[in-house]
Structure formats: structure tokens, C-alpha cells
């Protein structure tokens, strides 16, 4: 690696660039940017004399072995920084705007949209509907393709930014227009053709709505999506989430046990067929289907490397397997402790069974597991990630909580100790009069939290 730095000369490249100055929020320790003296508050003006329009441009331009950065310091002084580095080595720069541009909001009015089912009075950011392909690349968000221009598609292909996660929901163009309440939603499916032709890796999802895109429509969607293999690596099928706030919205019904069995029969039949032909299982059912149907979770190899974890596909199988491995490797009798843990109704039977095994291994440790009903959104919402502080307080106050209460990390806003209803961790500790530990979502972390490691 080689770095050189100099003040920017008057006769060198200059641009009218107000729109494309990107304020730097932070610099990673030990990074190239830190060694060069780049600091929070500096502005990135250009890379190799190219304006940086957004994060797509940035990731494409920094993937080079020789770079020339133009940086403007807070006092207006401009630095030209010449860098020699490994091709894909990151500079270690974090920007105030993660996308280096404005976020794109959703243009659809989906019949199943969860945000439309939220009560009034929550923090403003929770009501923002994103449908931005850049967030798909950066954070794994799913996009409907209705908000993507031909230029966006070409940039993804040319920059080879992948994977792109797509909310298909159905491959029936007319039905897709109706489900998304967007007359362009069917035509937008053709953009997946261009991504496939460009060799871009994709993942897909289908939010299943009873009597709408299930049954024969689901069969059609799976069949037609297989044409994108191998670029389309996986497709999840998850049941629509229904809250109690659906007044004035499309009258969707919750799935029942027999419905779940039929959905899983379809998925399993297609898995066998696709595996024989392509060597992958491709189509995956969300964990909720197996709980609702009363069926055993698939074995690990059926998940093809857990490509759909963020969609709730395979989370319980992974948790069980990680717990078993950590349990078999765990040593010692464990010190005397009295603990509690709260979780959603979906994971409760599995957490309860793990706690039972730990009590057998560590007899001096008492663990109380409490399932939390979602009174805030409604009892059809069973995942722990949508549990609020108010529900925890209402259902745990007066219970035996022991010296520590364990809560899964997905109950909290990313990177913060705040629940969806803005109750903070200290406020919950005060209300319940107990110290709370946040536990990561792995079997190993659960055992370590119980042992107090």
C-alpha cells in the first residue's frame, strides 16, 4: 500500500459539485482513511475525478488498485490523496447518509403492507416505506422493482452489485398489479429478466395471502421463478402478518393449520423436484408454517446455507443446532443462579425445551421462560422482534424474574436499547426492578448468558 497527500492545486480538476459533496460521519480505526488523516466532518468530493452520485457509484469507484480522492476539510482546504491498495480493500469511510443520496420511498399500496397496519402515534421513522435497490444491496432489504428505472438496472449490472433481494409475491402480472395496487407492478417483473441476463445473484420472497396468491397461483409462481436459477438462489414463502389495525384495508384472513399443511406440501414437492434438477432446494417455507401446521422443522441441509434467515426461514433450526453443539461442548456444573427469559410465542416451545436441558445440566441454575402475547399489534403477531416494552411490563410485572432477565436482541432497534414503542432498556429495568441482559440470537450466546459468561 502507498499513500501520498497534497493540497489541491488551482489549475487541477474542479467541478460545480454542491449536490455531490458527501459528509463523512466517521472513519474506522486502522483503516486507510485513518492513516490518511481523513476525519469526521470532512467531505468527499470525487474519486479519480469522478463525481460520486450515491453509494452504488462509491462502491464501484473504490474497487480499484489506484485511487485519487479529493477531500474538502471543514475549513475549506482541499486535499488530493493518492492511494495504492488491494483491489477490493475498503477505505474505512462512513457517511452521514448511508446511501449518499435521498432514500426512495415505496410507490405501492400493497394489500398486505405491515406499515399500513401500525397504530398511530409511533415514531415517524417507523412509517417510512422504503423500496430502494441500494438498500437491497447494502442491508438486504427486499424491493418490488416498481421503483427501479432502467438506469438503475444497468448500473447494478455494470457495477455487478449483488445480491439483489426481490419481493415477487406472484409472477402473474395482473394479480401482482392488484396485490401491490400499482398498475406498473406486472410490467416491473421484466426487470428481473435483465438482472438474470446480467448474471446478478438474487433472492426472492413471496408474502402469501389466503385466497389471493396461494394455491394454483403459488404453484405458478414457483414454476415460473425456477427459470431464473442459478442467479435466483432462493425464494421464501412467508405468511402475511396481520395486526389488529386493519380497518379500511383489504379483508385478508389468517391461515389455519390445514392451510399451512397445504402450503408446506406444495413447497416440499417443489423442493424435491428442483433439487433433482438443479441440486438446490430453492423454495423455502418460513418457520411459522411449520409451527402452525404442527410439523417438524426441516433438517439443516434443506436450507441451502440459510439464505433467508432475515425472512424468518430457518432461524429455529439454526438456533436448535447451535444450541445442541454448544450444549455438548459445555463444561462445568454452573454456579447457582436464578434467571428468566421472555420471548415471542413462535419461539417459546423451543426456548422452553432448551431451558429444560440446561436445568438438567446445571441443577443449581433456575430458568423461568415467559411467552409474551403481542397485545400491542394483536395476538396473530408471534415473533419476538415485534414485542414492545409495554407488553413486557404488563405481562412480567409481579412474575419471578430472578437476578437477571434475558431478552433477545431482535426486540430492540438496531444498535440501540429502545423498543418499538420507544420504551428504553433502563425504563424497563426500572419498571420490572430487574437487571436485563440482551442476548444475541444464537444457541451459543443463550448458553453463555445462562451461565453468566
Residue ranges and their predicted role:
Residues 1-17, 23, 294-453:
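Radical SAM enzyme core and accessory elements
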Residues 9, 59-95:
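PDZ-domain C-terminal substructure recognizer with occasional recognition of PDZ-binding tails
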Residues 20-29, 49-52:
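Short, structured beta-strand/loop micro-motifs enriched in basic residues and often containing a Trp
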Residues 33, 41-44, 69, 113:
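Terminal peptide-recognition signature
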Residues 35-53:
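Conserved PDZ fold ligand-binding element
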Residues 76-78, 85-231, 241-270:
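Conserved Radical SAM active-site core
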Residues 163-165, 201-203, 234-236, 282-284, ...:
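Structural preference for beta-strand elements that scaffold enzyme active sites
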Residues 212, 232-258, 278-301, 374-379, ...:
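Flexible glycine/acidic-rich beta-alpha junction loops that bind and position SAM and/or redox cofactors
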Amino acid at each position: 500500500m502507498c499513500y501520498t497527500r497534497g493540497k489541491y492545486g488551482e489549475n487541477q480538476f474542479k467541478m460545480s459539485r454542491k449536490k455531490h459533496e458527501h459528509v463523512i460521519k466517521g472513519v474506522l480505526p486502522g483503516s486507510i482513511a485513518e492513516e490518511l488523516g481523513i476525519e469526521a466532518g470532512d467531505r468527499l468530493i470525487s474519486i479519480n475525478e469522478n463525481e460520486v452520485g450515491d453509494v452504488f457509484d462509491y462502491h464501484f469507484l473504490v474497487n480499484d488498485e489506484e485511487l485519487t480522492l479529493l477531500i474538502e476539510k471543514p475549513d475549506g482546504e482541499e486535499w488530493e490523496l493518492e492511494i495504492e491498495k488491494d483491489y477490493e480493500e475498503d477505505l474505512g469511510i462512513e457517511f452521514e447518509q448511508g446511501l449518499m443520496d435521498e432514500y426512495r420511498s415505496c410507490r405501492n399500496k400493497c394489500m398486505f403492507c405491515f406499515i399500513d397496519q401500525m397504530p398511530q402515534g409511533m415514531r415517524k421513522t417507523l412509517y417510512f416505506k422504503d423500496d430502494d435497490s441500494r438498500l437491497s444491496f447494502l442491508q438486504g432489504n427486499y424491493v418490488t422493482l416498481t421503483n427501479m428505472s432502467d438506469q438503475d438496472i444497468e448500473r447494478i449490472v455494470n457495477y455487478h452489485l449483488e445480491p439483489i433481494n426481490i419481493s415477487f409475491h406472484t409472477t402473474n402480472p395482473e394479480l401482482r398489479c392488484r396485490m401491490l395496487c400499482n398498475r406498473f407492478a406486472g410490467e416491473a417483473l421484466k426487470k428481473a429478466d435483465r438482472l438474470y441476463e446480467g448474471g446478478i445473484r438474487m433472492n426472492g420472497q413471496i408474502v402469501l395471502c389466503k385466497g389471493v396468491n396461494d394455491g394454483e397461483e403459488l404453484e405458478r409462481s414457483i414454476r415460473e421463478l425456477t427459470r431464473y436459477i442459478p442467479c435466483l438462489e432462493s425464494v421464501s414463502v412467508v405468511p402475511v402478518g396481520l395486526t389488529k389495525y386493519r380497518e379500511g384495508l383489504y379483508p385478508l384472513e389468517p391461515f389455519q393449520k390445514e392451510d399451512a399443511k397445504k402450503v408446506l406440501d406444495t413447497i416440499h414437492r417443489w423442493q424435491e423436484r428442483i433439487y433433482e434438477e438443479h441440486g438446490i432446494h430453492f423454495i423455502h417455507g418460513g418457520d411459522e408454517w411449520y409451527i402452525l401446521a404442527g410439523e417438524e422443522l426441516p433438517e439443516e441441509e434443506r436450507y441451502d446455507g440459510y439464505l433467508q434467515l432475515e425472512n424468518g426461514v430457518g432461524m429455529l433450526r439454526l438456533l436448535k443446532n447451535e444450541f445442541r453443539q454448544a450444549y455438548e461442548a459445555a463444561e462445568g456444573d454452573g454456579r447457582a443462579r436464578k434467571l428468566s427469559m421472555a420471548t415471542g410465542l413462535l419461539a417459546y416451545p423451543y426456548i422452553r425445551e432448551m431451558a429444560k436441558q440446561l436445568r438438567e445440566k446445571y441443577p443449581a441454575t433456575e430458568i423461568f421462560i415467559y411467552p409474551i402475547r403481542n397485545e400491542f399489534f394483536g395476538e396473530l403477531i408471534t415473533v419476538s422482534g415485534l414485542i414492545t416494552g409495554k407488553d413486557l411490563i404488563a405481562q412480567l410485572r409481579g412474575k419471578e424474574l430472578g437476578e437477571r432477565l434475558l431478552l433477545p436482541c431482535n426486540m430492540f432497534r438496531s444498535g440501540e436499547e429502545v423498543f418499538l414503542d420507544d420504551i428504553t432498556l433502563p425504563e424497563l429495568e426500572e419498571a420490572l426492578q430487574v437487571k436485563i441482559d440482551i442476548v444475541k440470537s444464537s444457541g451459543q450466546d443463550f448458553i453463555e448468558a445462562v451461565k453468566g459468561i
